[in-house]
């Protein structure tokens, strides 16, 4: 983990109300470059809502968001993307009928000019070369760039989704990656592959926020863990200073909040 004095992403006093329901209550969260922050909590604790605030899908009722120290307002996911934040969704959001290179290039296609300079065509060969280079830099091994995503295993699909987010944020080593249950429904070997990729991204300077119910994964891959319970942050602790029993206590409410 790097030691930057300014967080890559910082949320202060975030409230999110749905009518009389307070989904988020004065949430303070920060993550630094090269750090993996685990975000834990039971169903309905507010994890997904908080991710949606970070990704620009939801606008908070009140509170402040800062990216690399600069105050930011996200009115849409495009705003957060422009700020250097990428979201890897639980459903992966891959195009099954397209090949790996095309999925890695979505939104940043390489075009070559058409006849007489009119219009333009996707340069698939150039995209495959770029995708191969990017995966090599990430230390990722996967199937051939021409293989359709629908023919990949669950673990391979997850790696493609993670790599797509990583290649979009990793150019200046200042990106922020939001991961929503990246190992859901994966087997042990596939989970290990994803876990290794997350650590490599952090080692390359990417700030990662990982939402998961998988406590062993969180303990293995995260530098720090924050726990939400009923919309409030009840714990924020380095992994080295906690254990499964403490985390389960905060998640279930059996253990009092660190901030009470």
Name each model-derived stretch.
Residues 2-260:
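Glycine-rich phosphate-binding loops of nucleotide-dependent enzymes
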